Amino acid sequence: MPTIQQLVRKGREQLVFKSKSPALDSCPQRRGVCTRVYTTTPKKPNSAMRKVARVRLTNSKEVNAYIPGEGHNLQEHSIVLIRGGRVKDLPGVRYHIVRGALDTAGVNGRKQSRSKYGAKRPKPGQAAAAPAKGKKK
């Protein structure tokens, strides 16, 4: 425990905030170019083939970014928009690709949470014609 005189001389050291998405440089999103698009497997209790892209950002940093949703049109040299947000079961993946922005297409046939996946609003007539995946009448 410091004395009052020691506190007058030195003061308390402020805790430094450490960013969870340092490659964004305090920006909400960043543009980048895909250098590699691949699938990888998650950590121990989970099992899947997660879609991931290696992206070179405009600030010349390289990051791994998750491609959310079912199916995607990304390949090498695609221009993508990156936002922060990690994937808990993929070590080293701290960013998400924004669907429906730049070269990334939205998710086809998405009815719910459309804004998160860049899906357009379905036309009123089409809603009844195409039943959702996995649903039975």
From Swiss-Prot:
Residues 104-137 are annotated as: Disordered. One of its GO terms (cellular component) is small ribosomal subunit. The keyword Ribosomal protein applies. Keywords: Methylation, Ribonucleoprotein, Ribosomal protein, RNA-binding, rRNA-binding, tRNA-binding. Gene3D superfamilies: Nucleic acid-binding proteins. One of its GO terms (biological process) is translation. InterPro entries: NA-bd_OB-fold, Ribosomal_uS12, Ribosomal_uS12_bac. Residues 111-123 have a biased composition (Basic residues). The modification 3-methylthioaspartic acid is found at residue 89. One of its GO terms (molecular function) is rRNA binding. The keyword Membrane does not apply. Residues 124-137 have a biased composition (Low complexity). Disulfide bonds: none annotated. Belongs to the universal ribosomal protein uS12 family. Part of the 30S ribosomal subunit. Contacts proteins S8 and S17. May interact with IF1 in the 30S initiation complex. With S4 and S5 plays an important role in translational accuracy. PANTHER family: 30S RIBOSOMAL PROTEIN S12 FAMILY MEMBER. This is Small ribosomal subunit protein uS12. It comes from Cytophaga hutchinsonii (strain ATCC 33406 / DSM 1761 / CIP 103989 / NBRC 15051 / NCIMB 9469 / D465). The gene is rpsL.
